[in-house]
A protein has these predicted regions:
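Class I SAM-dependent methyltransferase SAM/SAH-binding core
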Residues: 39-95, 117
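A short SAM/SAH-binding and catalytic strip from SAM-dependent methyltransferases
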Residues: 101-116, 136-138
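Core SAM-dependent methyltransferase catalytic element
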Residues: 186, 208-214, 254-264
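Short glycine-dipeptide loop
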Residues: 60, 126-132
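Conserved SAM-binding loop and adjacent beta-strand
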Residues: 11-29
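A short acidic, Gly/Pro-enriched loop at the edge of an enzyme's catalytic core
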Residues: 93-103
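C-terminal helical/coil "lid" or tail adjacent to the Rossmann-like core of SAM-dependent
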Residues: 191-246
């Protein structure tokens, strides 16, 4: 049975931050300069782990504001802030134009179709010359999964005989595409940084039952199928992984990507 949004937000706090988000935020820590910032906005901050880490690292005079994706995530983030006595300001408000000299956007868990919308929002709230960093997944990710999903969908005569898997592949933007998007909405001096992150599971069952895959990735990829067909595909995918990899672990890779630029 599909989980409620509140249940998903709880799982996201427990598992996704460590298993997924940290692999992306490492790019911010390595390549995004916040040393001269006076105020920072973190868009899609999740339950706040990286925002708290930035608070510890930056001068106490730097104001850190963070927006959350929904009310339940906001509640978790605020509870954490209270427990840690952190002054990171979590909210879901719409900030004024040109209010921040640094903006971070975590689009790593956002549908690719919303990428431009999030970059536009970052540009709107940034002052002229502000540094903007956007985290996302780019083309070449999940290839090991998509090829197996295509085979399962084709064999089971689902998803228009594998067409759904082909759409999963083509939906992910290339580096050129996200650079073009950034320049189109007003960023200059655009650069990208990519880390090839590998996720490993003992076998097919461990893969399809992991919270990242079972509760977040597969439901999005198989959204066009009814619940019964989704379960059938999941079971067949697990079996196919084991038949192909034998006693070896199953791995898939993700192109964790940071795009940086300055508002012109």
């Amino acid at each position: 049975m599909a989980k409620t949004q509140k249940e998903l937000d709880f799982l996201r706090d427990l598992y996704i931050g460590a298993d997924w988000t940290r692999r992306f935020t490492d790019l911010i820590d390595k390549h995004f300069d916040l040393s001269e910032s006076e105020n920072v906005l973190y868009i899609n901050a999740g339950t706040g782990e990286h925002a708290f880490a930035l608070r510890e690292r930056l001068d106490e005079k730097v104001g850190i504001f963070a927006t959350c994706e929904d009310d339940d995530i906001l509640h978790i983030a605020r509870d954490k802030a209270a427990a840690m006595r952190s002054d990171v300001d979590f909210s879901m408000i719409r900030f004024e134009d040109e209010a921040f000299d640094s903006v971070i956007v975590d689009a790593s868990f956002t549908p690719p179709s919303r990428y431009e919308e999030l970059v536009e929002e970052a540009v709107r709230v940034a002052t002229t010359g502000a540094n903007i960093g956007v985290l996302s997944v780019t083309s070449g990710s999940f290839g090991e999964i998509f090829s197996l999903l295509w085979e399962v969908l084709f064999n089971e005569e689902l998803g228009e005989h594998g067409h759904a898997a082909e759409e999963m592949i083509t939906e992910l933007p290339t580096l050129t595409m996200i650079k073009d998007t950034a320049r189109r909405v007003g960023l200059e001096n655009v650069q990208t940084y990519v880390a090839n992150e590998v996720f490993e599971y003992d076998d097919g069952a461990a893969f399809v039952s992991s919270p990242l895959v079972a509760d977040f990735l597969l439901p999005v990829w198989l959204v066009t199928l009814d619940e019964e067909d989704q379960q059938r595909v999941t079971d067949k995918l697990s079996q196919l992984i084991d038949s192909e990899d034998g006693n070896l672990s199953f791995r898939f890779s993700v192109k964790a990507t940071l795009l940086t630029g300055e508002k012109g």
